[in-house]
Amino acid sequence: MVKLTSIAAGVAAIAAGVAAAPATTTLSPSDERVNLVELGVYVSDIRAHLAQYYLFQAAHPTETYPVEIAEAVFNYGDFTTMLTGIPAEQVTRVITGVPWYSTRLRPAISSALSKDGIYTAIPK
């Protein structure tokens, strides 16, 4: 015989798991919410690997970055409002323009989007 407390505990655990699951949203890759998540990961990556970014910048002096990104890197407060309004194509260019995009940034961005319940779809 199964005890009622076991059933109640199981139901509570299932309910907690359902409640903890984030709602999902499918957005265009150029949606500003997607861009903000991408830029948040990018800024965090720059902070964690600053020397590597400096070396990349020295080797590619014509690669420019929006001033908002530099400000966000060195402002350790809430920087998300600084990053709004950067055009999607510029976000894509700076993020995919580094050699470690595929190995480090893309997986981190995918993880951050998934954690926020955001999935991207190419518009038809």
Curated annotation (Swiss-Prot):
A biological process from GO: fungal-type cell wall organization
Entry GO MF terms: structural constituent of cell wall
Name listed for the protein in its UniProt record: Seripauperin-19
Cited InterPro entries: SRP1_TIP1 (IPR000992), Yeast_SRP1/TIP1_CWP (IPR050788)
Cellular component per GO, a single term: fungal-type cell wall
Family label: Belongs to the SRP1/TIP1 family. Seripauperin subfamily.
Keywords: Signal
Signal peptide, first to last residue: 1-20
